Every structure is written in structure tokens, then in C-alpha cells.
Amino acid sequence: MNRITSLLGTQYPIIQGGMVWCSGWRLASAVSNAGGLGLIGAGSMHPDTLREHIRKCNAATKFPFGVNIPLMYPQIEEIMNIVVEEGVKIVFTSAGNPKTWTGWLKERGITVVHVVSSSRFAMKCEEAGVDAVVAEGFEAGGHNGREETTTFCLIPAVREATTLPLIAAGGIGTGEGILAAMVLGAEGVQIGTRFALTEESSASPVFKEYCLSLGEGDTKLLLKKLAPTRLVKNAFREAVEKAEDSGATSEELRTLLGRGRAKKGIFEGDLEEGELEIGQVSAIISRRQSVAEVMNELVESYRQAVEKKYLFER
């Protein structure tokens, strides 16, 4: 047991990322049942849909689970009230100022974890009173920080800057990766891509199969004038790159992006015109597995990595 498992009430310090269009109740409950912490991704749900997923997750697992809430959510007050009404005990927040909601949530007995992309924001989280931070590096899928700091560099920087329990994210998908994060100063890991491609993920099977075929360099961080987003190669990404190369304004990029592209790509499986989001670690994932298989593999490969001798001294 360490500070993360103690805080979250889990067997393992492994958290499933609350990804849009992937992280419904089936995925979250499966991860929690396997010893990790499952997160429902509120970012792609209407309030009533979120309530339904929370109730179904409660029925599917007796273990802790949480909800990931982007603070930029337009119906944020309604979402927060639903979380309280439905008895959710753990909330991960992102994409906003942690001071806005942390106190309100903690007054209602909820554990609060905030996602950051820099040591500067980690210190702000400590000032805000969060219970732990997720430090997410450049390798992660979806929306990224503007700093473009890799996980390998970010974790020790955040560890030095704050005493908060630290969860590493971005580019982690193996037991060896978990061990590396721990050595760098993390006490837990948040894994998105590996779980997004499992059987229980609500993402389109077409999207999953395409992502399982990706190699190094097939994702790229774009849309930096809006919100930096790691996108998979397809016709839409080519259009974004062309627009950015020609000096498109923020407004022109918003028009190109339109509405519903992430749903079209990730949930509906439109591989050409959809916004396909996945992390760099997809390059080393080639099989679709169940959550139980992934968790068993992560834990076993972590244990094997710990037992190896890495000494270079004679």
C-alpha cells in the first residue's frame, strides 16, 4: 500500500483515464473490479447520461470508482450536483482552475485529484487543497498542455515542486513503464490509451482496430492555437496541418474543427473525417484485450521488472 492506494481505496495504484467517448460505466467498473480505479469520462456526456452511467457503475462494482470532469464543461454546476447527489466519492478534475471547485467538493466529502501539465500548476493545486495530482506528459492522447514536457521530464519536476501524492500519466502502457514512473517519483499511474483499446471501452471497434495498427510517428500534437490535441493521421488531420501551415487563425481552425468531430471519430468510427485521439504509446499496443487481461499483464510485467537487476556497477 502507498499514498495513492490508501487515498483511493484500490488494490493497485493504477487509474484508468477518464477519456471522452471511451470511458463509460462498463470500462470504469471493469477497471475497478480488477483492482484499479475506473473513471467515468463526463466530458462527452450530457448530465442525464452521466447520472445513468454513475448508477450503472454503482450496480456493476462494489469497489471505488470516480468521475473525470473537465472544468470547462458548459453545464458544470449541474454536473457537480449530480456527482454529489449520486454519492460519487472521487472526482478527477482537469482543464481549469482547481480553486474553483476543490473546496466545494471536499466540503461534501469528495476526494479531489487534478490533472496538470507543469510543476507550476502542480503548486497551484497544492494551494487549492487538492488531495493528489496527475502529472500528464506530452505523450498523452487527446488534449495536452502547452508546455510539451515529456513524462520522463515532468514527473521529477513535479515531485520536486510539491509534496502531494503524485500520479504519472502520458505514454504509460506497460508494467515497465509503471516502474519507470515510480522510480522518477510517482506513486501511481493513470493509463488512458491502453484502456481505450480494451473490449469494455465504449469507443468504436473500427477506431480501436485502426489505433492498434499505428506505429511511431502516427500521432501528432496539433491545434495549438486552440487546445493542443494529439491527433491520429487521417484526412481531417491532414486538413488541420494544411490550415496551420498556411497560417490559419484561431477562428478559422474552430470553423474547420466544427462540432462533434471527436464523437464522429472515436465513438462512430469515421476514420477519415473524425477527430481521432490516442496517445503515443499506441505504437507498442497491437492486441485488443479485456480489462482483466490488461490489468493482469500490467501487474505481472511490473513485478517481473522489479525483480530484474539494473545495476551497472561492478
Predicted features, each with a name:
Residues 1-161, 165:
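Active-site entrance/lid segments in N-terminal catalytic domains of soluble metabolic enzymes
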Residues 115, 170-171:
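Conserved acidic functional residues
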Residues 145-167, 173-314:
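Conserved active-site-proximal phosphate/metal-binding subdomains
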Residues 19, 171-172:
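Active-site metal-binding loops of divalent metal-dependent hydrolases
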